[in-house]
């Protein structure tokens, strides 16, 4: 909610759930642009977006970025379940510990309780972690580029993919980059393996870098990325994640 020319007001859309401890704990500190955002605000936000968020994260392995003391405190990345965390888990072949997953809006409230500010699910089918259900191109710009450059790059990539018959969607990442997503759909289509998904997206990234080397690069090398956009295809490997 924005009031006049003042700061953006973080206003919960629901009351904090009874199970939420320390609901007034500040996770995002107050700035000149917005008021402080509390644990209760995070719970309310998850409640608000549950219907749209869960189809992209539920029943998949999910890695969490947790900040128990807010943005000014320590952060850590969590993949596996742990005692005291009221979240379902999913078994992954080759891993002794099950991964955290989500099944319901109530699980999102548990994320608020755990101060999980970011969700990074696998790009797999629900309950089928060995089968990709989307291709992800992460457009990662050099620091000197503007967001408009990334938007133009996304349009270029979308044009290339749609010329191949793919349906594409654009997703923000929370930073300066963008994700270009290609859903893998069709009941008659044989789904690709993780290796095939990674190989295909790598070939697209390489094609862009070859056709427009002044704009795109398909390697992680910092030196080669100067003034360019890295077309990151590595999020299509098994166990790789992308922010929800």
Tell where the protein language model's regions lie, with residue ranges.
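Helical (often loop-to-helix) elements that flank the catalytic cores of nucleotide-handling enzymes
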Residues: 77-97, 146-162, 182-215, 235-244
């Amino acid at each position: 909610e924005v009031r006049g020319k003042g700061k953006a007001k973080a206003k919960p859309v629901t009351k904090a759930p009874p199970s939420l401890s320390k609901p007034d704990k500040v996770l995002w500190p107050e700035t000149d642009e917005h008021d402080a955002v509390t644990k209760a605000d995070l719970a309310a936000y998850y409640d608000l977006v549950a219907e749209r968020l869960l189809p992209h994260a539920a029943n998949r392995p999910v890695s969490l970025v947790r900040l128990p003391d807010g943005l000014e405190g320590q952060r850590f990345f969590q993949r596996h379940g742990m005692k005291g965390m009221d979240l379902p888990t999913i078994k992954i072949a080759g891993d002794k510990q099950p991964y955290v997953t989500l099944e319901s809006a109530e699980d999102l409230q548990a994320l608020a309780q755990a101060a999980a500010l970011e969700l990074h699910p696998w790009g797999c089918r629900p309950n089928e972690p060995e089968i990709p259900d989307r291709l992800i191109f992460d457009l990662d710009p050099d620091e000197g580029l503007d967001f408009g450059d990334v938007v133009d790059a996304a349009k270029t990539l979308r044009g290339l993919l749609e010329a191949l018959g793919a349906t594409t969607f654009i997703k923000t990442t929370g930073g300066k980059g963008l994700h270009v997503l290609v859903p893998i759909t069709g009941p008659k289509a044989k789904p690709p393996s993780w290796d095939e998904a990674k190989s295909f997206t790598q070939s697209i990234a390489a094609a862009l870098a070859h056709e427009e080397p002044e704009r795109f690069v398909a390697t992680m090398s910092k030196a080669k990325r100067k003034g360019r956009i890295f077309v990151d295809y590595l999020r299509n490997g098994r166990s790789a994640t992308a922010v929800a």
